[in-house]
Swiss-Prot record:
Transmembrane segments: none
Keywords in alphabetical order: Cytoplasm, Lipopolysaccharide biosynthesis, Nucleotidyltransferase, Transferase
GO molecular function terms listed in the Swiss-Prot or TrEMBL record: 3-deoxy-manno-octulosonate cytidylyltransferase activity
Gene that encodes it: kdsB
A Pfam family assignment: CTP_transf_3
Xref: HAMAP family: KdsB (MF_00057)
Family as reported in the entry's similarity comment: Belongs to the KdsB family.
Biological pathway: Nucleotide-sugar biosynthesis; CMP-3-deoxy-D-manno-octulosonate biosynthesis; CMP-3-deoxy-D-manno-octulosonate from 3-deoxy-D-manno-octulosonate and CTP: step 1/1; Bacterial outer membrane biogenesis; lipopolysaccharide biosynthesis
Name the UniProt record assigns to this protein: 3-deoxy-manno-octulosonate cytidylyltransferase
Catalytically driven reaction(s): 3-deoxy-alpha-D-manno-oct-2-ulosonate + CTP = CMP-3-deoxy-beta-D-manno-octulosonate + diphosphate
Purpose: Activates KDO (a required 8-carbon sugar) for incorporation into bacterial lipopolysaccharide in Gram-negative bacteria.
CC per GO annotation: cytosol
InterPro entries for this protein: Cytidylyl_trans, KdsB, Nucleotide-diphossugar_trans
Intracellular or extracellular location(s): Cytoplasm
């Protein structure tokens, strides 16, 4: 039986909120909050993959297993792929990518992503989404939208509003069609991760700045379904950080 692992990619030099992995949340760095949240799951191992000696030292201090990776990776998936190779995981194993800036991610969603990949044998990656209910979220490029087929395989991810119903105003769109926000959690087959770095980088991946488009561009399938629980947005800005701090201080 395949083992299931959680890997948390943690980059120190984030662009929008520098050093956010070490940002204080109710007396603990954010990376520790994320780690403590995922330890509530029952997977085989939990690893932090980072390019920072500082993050590694802090993570070791609270008992985490850490893999130090290169600092030139273009995405969290690239970082995880290196970590998986170093750790020697078996090809049949599954790795769940939990973002290091999501301290409030529901455990149910982590487990759901892993189970979805187990159930969808044609997919090499699985992920989750949730229905958009606020029209402003449709047009916010920070909210990645996704469309998928009747068998729950992703067709496309975009920062633009997809789908678009021609002939209706922006405000009317949400009443005409369903829109889904992509939730940035992924489960991967280890065999796929081991050759991920060899895949062709696609123009659309660069245009949209969405790493998952590399998977689709190279002809692989991504399974997707609506999340069991609503997932709070990750911490990308100072405003996001303040919201999370308030929730932990309640």
């Amino acid at each position: 039986m395949a083992n299931i692992h959680i890997v948390i990619p943690a980059r120190l030099k984030s662009t929008r909120l520098p050093n956010k992995m070490l940002a204080d949340i109710a007396g603990k760095p954010m990376i520790q909050r994320v780690y403590e949240q995922v330890t509530k799951s029952k997977f085989d191992s939990i690893i932090i993959a980072t390019d920072s000696q500082k993050i590694k030292d802090i993570a070791k201090s609270f008992g985490a297993k850490v893999v130090l990776t290169r600092d030139d990776h273009q995405s969290g998936t690239d970082r995880i792929a290196e970590a998986v190779t170093k750790l020697g995981f078996a090809d049949e194993d599954i790795v769940v990518n939990v973002q290091g800036d999501e301290p409030l991610i529901p455990i149910e969603n982590i487990e759901q992503a892993a189970q979805l990949l187990i159930d969808k044998s044609e997919a090499v990656v699985s992920t989750l989404c949730e229905k958009i209910t606020d029209v402003e979220d449709i047009y916010n490029p920070n909210n990645v939208k996704v469309v998928f087929d009747k068998n729950n395989y992703a067709l496309y991810f975009s920062r633009a509003s997809i789908p678009f119903e021609r002939g209706f105003s922006e405000k009317e769109q949400i009443n005409i069609s369903e829109f889904f926000r992509h939730i940035g959690i992924y489960a991967y087959r280890v065999a796929f991760l081991k050759h991920y770095a060899e895949l062709t980088v696609s123009p659309i991946e660069k245009y949209e700045a969405l790493e998952q488009l590399k998977v689709l561009y190279n002809g692989y399938k991504i399974a997707i379904e609506q999340s069991a629980k609503s997932t709070p947005a990750g911490v990308d800005t100072l405003q996001d950080l303040e919201k999370v701090r308030k929730l932990f201080n309640v």
